[in-house]
Amino acid sequence: MNAHEALAEIAGKMFGDNAKKVMMVLASNVEVSDEDLAKDLKMDPPELRKLLNDLFEARLVKYRRARDENIGWYKYYWRITDEPIQQILSDRKRLTLSILEKVLSLEENSETYVCPKCGTRYTVDEAENNNYTCEVCGEVLEPFDNTHRVEKLKRAIELLGNWDPSPKQQASRAIPHA
């Protein structure tokens, strides 16, 4: 799998099939305007622009803006990023670990309540403010045992913490050890 195919796979996992299709079109071109992309992929232009912006925020694509002298508007030309995939993945790993660790801390250090009927969760303060009744359906709230969630978060942090996005590490995983 080459770098562009890998980026397309990543985009597909993050944003869905349309993102993968966009990345594949961009991989076969130097630059493509969002208008041409929309035509090629038969996508609604505003939907495509939102997807391109999501891909840009994820650092998977870049753009160049040029003024159309005839109408005075800007045209945007998109291309696949030139950043190393490993750097993008390492940064995303770091960000994801940070978020997971914050969520774990909240889960371990706070008491929550849940509605047995509709499943809405409440912090202890929210539960107290509502007299331990659900705002949605009026049921009496029950303490929520988040032990399972805490264990899942710890496992996810462990797995992600041990994951190395470098090509050398990925190649060694593909080869069975004797």
UniProtKB/Swiss-Prot annotation:
It comes from the Archaea. The keyword Membrane does not apply. InterPro entries: TF_E_archaea, TFE, TFIIE/TFIIEa_HTH, TFIIE_asu, TFIIEa/SarR/Rpc3_HTH_dom, WH-like_DNA-bd_sf, WH_DNA-bd_sf, Znf_TFIIB. Keywords: DNA-binding, Transcription, Transcription regulation. Pfam families: TFIIE_alpha (PF02002), Zn_Ribbon_TF (PF08271). GO terms for molecular function: DNA binding. One of its GO terms (biological process) is regulation of DNA-templated transcription. Residues 3-86 form the HTH TFE/IIEalpha-type domain. Monomer. Interaction with RNA polymerase subunits RpoF and RpoE is necessary for Tfe stimulatory transcription activity. Able to interact with Tbp and RNA polymerase in the absence of DNA promoter. Interacts both with the preinitiation and elongation complexes. Transcription factor that plays a role in the activation of archaeal genes transcribed by RNA polymerase. Facilitates transcription initiation by enhancing TATA-box recognition by TATA-box-binding protein (Tbp), and transcription factor B (Tfb) and RNA polymerase recruitment. Not absolutely required for transcription in vitro, but particularly important in cases where Tbp or Tfb function is not optimal. It dynamically alters the nucleic acid-binding properties of RNA polymerases by stabilizing the initiation complex and destabilizing elongation complexes. Belongs to the TFE family. The winged helix domain is involved in binding to DNA in the preinitiation complex. This is Transcription factor E. It comes from Thermofilum pendens (strain DSM 2475 / Hrk 5).
